[in-house]
């Protein structure tokens, strides 16, 4: 009996091509995820700045007190226990320890420091809240 000559790929060839394709796809996903996490971290810092500036502007204007509570998964911006804004940390950004930053009715902030560690950028962010008019600085150090 003569074997018919059929055109097409064998099962082994198809499996080899699919395996290589899946492997290449998996290799490319990891850098994309890292880039996404870096962007999410940048967005977090912009939102943090916006929320902080809003808080130190509204508090003295209304003569109310304000607080920023730094928890393990989020920062909460509070104006006189009435208005709260939740800002969740992006994946890979971790708070060193719980902190509470108080803003007086006149808008003054006492000096304090909050520390974050980033698994994504491999940096330590040291936020130093300065005396007086609600200013802060972020210092970045290599982990």
Regions found by a protein language model. Give the residues of each.
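N-terminal single-pass transmembrane signal-anchor helix
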Residues: 1-32
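Membrane-proximal N-terminal amphipathic helix
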Residues: 37-65
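N-terminal helix-rich module
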Residues: 34, 57, 61, 65, ...
